[in-house]
Amino acid sequence: YLLATSLTNAALTMDIRLVELVSHLGQQLSEGEIIQLSNTNASDFSEAVYFDVIKKKTAALFSTAAAAGAKSVHSTDEIAKKAALIGELIGIAFQIKDDIFDYNASDELGKPTGNDMKEGKLTLPALYVLNTYQDSSMIDLALKIRALEASDEEIARFIDYVKQHGGLEYAS
């Protein structure tokens, strides 16, 4: 809904550059979601896939917002590209920080611990630990998490393992 509304609003500006930006965002978001969904049964734990997904989703949102802001005040294409790059980098940093928050309970954030894992998502801290330590029992548990078959207790055990093995420090 929000993307469709954004596209409508971009069209109302009569600025084809904004329409192209929002249309491209829709394509990127769709590609990111497809990559993420196709990775749910993967037996590997690729950081490259993780970064591809966040670049096409969160970072694309930030990048488009920054570029649209620049273009809406009639900046040059060069300035708009720089704004888009800054937005992309902020989006990547934002997503990694959000993923780190998933390892710590906080009423302030309104995000329960392990929420990403309860949705079958393994993020940068977990990927680092899985690839670095190659612990077969944790790999099996990670596959269970991806398949949405892990209990809350198993997710809590996995979170502790990631924290104890430097996953949060790596992602920071």
Language model features by range: what are they?
Residues 1-172:
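All-alpha prenyltransferase/terpene-synthase fold signal
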